[in-house]
């Protein structure tokens, strides 16, 4: 070890939350459940063409609730999700995203990256941002206000948000829907 000794104060406010609802399973049940999950996830893929089918708001809300169950640095849950269905707002998001995408696709320094994307047929035009019945916009929260109103840092923000989005994608998939992650930089 480094020879350093760290002394941690025992928290007087710490109260462990008992884990309830645990079902003890046999090895064969565990294997079966893991195989079922694997087979379900093998069917997951992104799409760029969305149907006009209405999806109830409650479905999207429940998927976001699943994302909210993701583990996070210091259990801060440093994310915020916004649900967008308003056509005017979706058009504004599309226009802003396409402006950024045009810069990306015209940047000669990104030639290798663009060649890697070529088999997927991606381009600067993002009609799916208007066509999808819902857009879910994820925001990372690097800081939050504590109970005294002071700014306090959140920890492992990119990792925590990434895990939450992974939960969200899985929830969307398990409802029978599909999604596409879109990450225009610097949006």
Please give the residue ranges for each predicted region.
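N-terminal accessory segments that position/regulate proteins before the catalytic core
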Residues: 1-62, 92-95, 103-106
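Glycine/small-residue-rich phosphate/adenosyl-binding loop
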Residues: 10, 80-162
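Small-aliphatic-rich amphipathic alpha-helix that forms the alpha element of a beta-alpha
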Residues: 44, 63-68, 136, 142-187
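Short catalytic-loop micro-motif centered on adjacent basic/acidic residues
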Residues: 49-51, 80, 178-182
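Short beta->alpha junction loops/turns
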Residues: 53, 82, 86, 184-186
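Glycine-rich phosphate/pyrophosphate-binding beta-alpha loops
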Residues: 68-75
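Short gly/pro-enriched beta-turn/loop segments at secondary-structure junctions
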Residues: 76-77, 129-132, 172-175
């Amino acid at each position: 070890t480094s020879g350093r000794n760290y002394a941690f104060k025992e928290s007087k406010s710490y109260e462990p939350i008992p884990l309830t609802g645990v079902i003890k399973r046999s090895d064969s049940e565990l294997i079966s459940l893991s195989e079922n999950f694997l087979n379900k996830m093998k069917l997951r893929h992104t799409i760029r063409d969305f149907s006009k089918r209405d999806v109830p708001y409650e479905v999207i809300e429940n998927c976001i609730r699943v994302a909210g169950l993701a583990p996070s640095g210091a259990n801060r849950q440093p994310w915020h999700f916004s649900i967008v269905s308003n056509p005017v707002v979706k058009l504004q998001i599309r226009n802003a995203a396409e402006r950024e995408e045009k810069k990306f696709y015209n940047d000669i320094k990104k030639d290798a990256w663009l060649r890697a994307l070529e088999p997927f047929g991606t381009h600067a035009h993002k009609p799916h941002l208007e066509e999808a019945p819902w857009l879910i916009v994820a925001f990372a929260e690097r800081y939050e206000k504590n109970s005294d109103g002071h700014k306090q840092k959140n920890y492992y923000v990119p990792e925590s948000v990434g895990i939450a989005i992974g939960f969200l994608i899985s929830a969307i998939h398990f409802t029978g829907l599909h999604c596409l992650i879109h990450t225009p930089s610097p949006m």
